[in-house]
Swiss-Prot record:
Localization terms from the record: Secreted
Ranges that cross the membrane: none
Protein name: U7-lycotoxin-Ls1e
Disulfide bond listed as a keyword: yes
Signal peptide extent: 1-22
Assigned GO CC terms: extracellular region
Family (UniProt): Belongs to the neurotoxin 19 (CSTX) family. 07 (U7-Lctx) subfamily.
Species name: Lycosa singoriensis (Wolf spider)
Tissue: Expressed by the venom gland.
Keyword Zinc attached: no
Disulfide bridge positions per record: none
GO molecular function list: toxin activity
InterPro entries linked to this entry: Spider_toxin_CSTX_knottin
Length: 78
């Protein structure tokens, strides 16, 4: 009887750990995903980089993406 209870508890613990790990992996945003200024939402080795958009001199808002940490984009010179 003790063996059945122990086995049941062990299985419950294993299933719980697998579920928690799956939730933690799905909680972060992959590379190229739209993010907010909350840097914690991007997966490891990624940061949320934002820039302001302009069209014909008028600001059209801010866009943010998860990109590799340290990577910098710059405007192409025409």
């Amino acid at each position: 009887m003790k063996l059945i209870i122990f086995t049941g508890l062990a299985l419950l613990l294993i299933v719980s750990l697998i579920d928690v790990e799956a939730q933690n992996e799905g909680a972060c945003l992959p590379r190229g995903s739209v993010c907010t200024t909350n840097h914690a939402s991007c997966c490891s080795k990624l940061s949320c980089d934002c820039y302001r958009r302009f069209e014909k001199g008028v600001e059209k808002g801010q866009k943010c993406w998860c990109i590799p940490t340290g990577l910098r984009y710059s405007k192409e010179k025409e």
